[in-house]
Every structure is written in C-alpha cells, then in structure tokens.
Amino acid sequence: MTILRKSHPLMKMVNHAFIDLPTPSNISGWWNFGSLLGLCLIIQIASGLFLAMHYTSDTITAFSSVAHICRDVNYGWLIRYIHANGASLFFICLYLHIGRGIYYGSYMYKETWNIGIMLLFLTMATAFMGYVLPWGQMSFWGATVITNLLSAIPYVGSTLVEWIWGGFSVDKATLTRFFAFHFILPFIIAATAMVHLLFLHETGSNNPLGIPSDSDKIPFHPYYTFKDLLGVIIILASFLSFVLFFPDLLGDPDNYSPANPLNTPPHIKPEWYFLFAYAILRSIPNKLGGVIALVLSILVLALFPLLHTANQRSMMFRPISQFLFWTLVSDLFILTWIGGQPVEPPFIIIGQVASILYFSIILVFLPIAGLIENKVLKW
C-alpha cells in the first residue's frame, strides 16, 4: 500500500515540494533565506490581519486608530511593532537572498530569477503603501513625493498622478485605495512565490560550487527541514528581541506627528530599505532622469543572466568578481547612508559617484572580470 503523502492529491504536492524533494547535499546557510522569506510573509499577513481589524482608513481617524491600537487593544502595541519591524526583517532577508543569487550565479535559472524580481517590485509597492497608512507626517509627505514622481512621465504624467490620488492631492481617496491594495498585495505575493517555487523545482536548487549536483542529492526532509528550523529559531529570537527592546529604532520620529499638508518636514525620506534607491533618484538633477534611474536600479537585476560572461557559474573561485561583488555591497551601504542625508555638499557628490559605481560594476566591470578570469584561470 502506498503511503498517504505519496498518493493523496494534496499531500503529493506538499511531498514533492518539501519532503521528498531532491536537494544538493552541499547548500550552505545562504540557502535558508527562501524559507525565512516565507516566514516573514506569514508573520506580516497574520499581524496585518489583526491590525486591519482595528484600523480605519479615513484621513480624520487613521492616526487616532493606530494610537488606539497601541493603547487600548490587547497586545496591540506588540502586533503593531511586529508588523512595522517585520517589514525591515522582510527586506533584510530579501536583500541577502538576492545577494546570494548574484554571488552563486543562481540568476542563470532565468524564470525563477525574473519572477523573483517581480516579487521584489510587489514587496516594495506593498511596503510603500503600508508606510502611508498610519497617516503621520512622513506617511503623508512620503506619499506625496513618491507618487508625484510619476508626473515626470511625458504627456500622461499629471493625469496619472491625479488618477492615483483620486483627486488633486493626497487625501481620503488615496488613503482608502492604498489600504485596499496594501491588504490584497501580500496574497498576490504569496501566489507569485508559489510560481517562484514551481519554476525552482523544475530545475532544482543551485549550490555553492555552481556545478550540476544530480549525482549527489539528498531528500529535503529531514536534512533541510531541520536546517531551516535552526534559521527560523535564530531569526525569530533576534527579531523578537529587537521588537521588544528597540521597537522605534528604524522608524521616523516625524511619523508620531499627525499628517499636516500645511507643514513640510525638513527632510522627507523613506524607510531605510528604500534609501539606496532614493539616493540614486536624487543623484540625477533631472526629474525624469531620476525616475528612470530609480526604476533601472532594480530592473538592472534582470540583466544579470545576459551579462554573465564567466565560464564558471559561481563566484566561489573567481577572485576578481568576488572583489567587485563586495565593492557593490559596500557601495549599496554608502547609497543607503547618503539617502538618509540632506541634499547638500559633500553628500551630493558622494551620492553621484556611488550611483555611477553601482551601475558600472553591474553593467561593465563584472562582465569584463568574467572574461579576464576565463583567460587567467584557463577555464
């Protein structure tokens, strides 16, 4: 008699995806972030659902409803801070997951990689709209500034912005639709993540050596279920410690003031996880040019499979590419720092140099490094 997990239609799908899945025997801790992203999504959907039960998406009561959640709802403060800091955890895991993909050449699975880029865009859109909901000063002005960027699009820009706003400024209509989209998008992300997994399981996982591992596979369960569980325990312990000891560390103090259209904050800036893109946007004096650079800073990821010139897939044995990769990581830290600084010397020139370096490493230096390594390593 066949065991149930191999015969039952639903259990069979779970079995093929998480139990009997043939997995390379040598994948490292860098492969834990996929499961951790799934955990983040579950945490965000669960905490968000409870917040939505008490939140009101009206300009007059939105700010008060968030205060009410923190003061009057049982453990409302905890749910709110888990949700707010959960977004930061989500992006930390996302960026590490993407970095792993770049370092070990996982982008060669084109379908999986491109769906991953779509997931990144969806997550960024969700996070942006969620930031608007508490209706504090930075929520309001962040929404105004970022949506206004669309007015740089020729011909249709201004009409498009008013269409998104639902009026002539960010107001009740904007807040209501942002709440609706913020609620539905995580479920779309979950569905897209399933497609991401589907394509990944068509090819099987990559591994640190970047070589085919068909001759050396082990079942996902129990080996990687327990390895993932260790990652989950470490991340949850760190995350809860952070939420309970430093809940406001990553937030903006301006967001504790109710939205006021008549008073502009001195420095309008997004959450820390968007600062690198914000720095690239600001480094170009032209509005349309800045918007194009902003979009390209993420879209450039789609070019990685096309710009791969090395004969080896992974960077594990490619010292020049390794150096460039870590330079790129350092550059992203610099851009993140610059994005949080005011637009004045010396920050302007540092941001411009860092932006040029970001695109140069990806589009020029890494492909050249691949060709040099082919020659030098006689591969």
Swiss-Prot record:
Gene Ontology molecular function terms on file: metal ion binding; ubiquinol-cytochrome-c reductase activity
Ligand binding (a ubiquinone): H201
PROSITE patterns referenced in this protein's UniProt entry, alphabetically: CYTB_CTER (PS51003), CYTB_NTER (PS51002)
Cofactor: heme b
Recorded coiled-coil stretches: none
Lineage: Eukaryota, Metazoa, Chordata, Craniata, Vertebrata
Consequence of changing I368V: In strain: Isolate LVT 3645
Keyword Electron transport: yes
PANTHER family from the UniProt entry: CYTOCHROME B
Binding locations of heme b b566: H97, H196
Cofactor note (record): Binds 2 heme b groups non-covalently.
Membrane topology: Multi-pass membrane protein
Domain of life: Eukaryota
Primary localization: mitochondrion
Effect upon mutating M118I: In strain: Isolate LVT 3645
Outcome reported for the amino acid change (mutating I60M): In strain: Isolate LVT 3645
Cellular component annotations (GO), alphabetically ordered: mitochondrial inner membrane; respiratory chain complex III
Keywords: Electron transport, Heme, Iron, Membrane, Metal-binding, Mitochondrion, Mitochondrion inner membrane, Respiratory chain, Transmembrane, Transmembrane helix, Transport, Ubiquinone
Subunit comment: The cytochrome bc1 complex contains 11 subunits: 3 respiratory subunits (MT-CYB, CYC1 and UQCRFS1), 2 core proteins (UQCRC1 and UQCRC2) and 6 low-molecular weight proteins (UQCRH/QCR6, UQCRB/QCR7, UQCRQ/QCR8, UQCR10/QCR9, UQCR11/QCR10 and a cleavage product of UQCRFS1). This cytochrome bc1 complex then forms a dimer.
Effect of T23A: In strain: Isolate LVT 3645
Outcome of swapping V376I: In strain: Isolate LVT 3645
InterPro entries in alphabetical order: Cyt_b/b6_C, Cyt_b/b6_C_sf, Cyt_b/b6_N, Cytb/b6-like_sf, Cytochrome_b, Cytochrome_b_C_euk/bac, Cytochrome_b_N_euk/bac, Di-haem_cyt_TM
Record-stated family: Belongs to the cytochrome b family.
Biological source species: Chaetodipus arenarius (Little desert pocket mouse)
Record protein name field: Cytochrome b
Compartments it resides in: Mitochondrion inner membrane
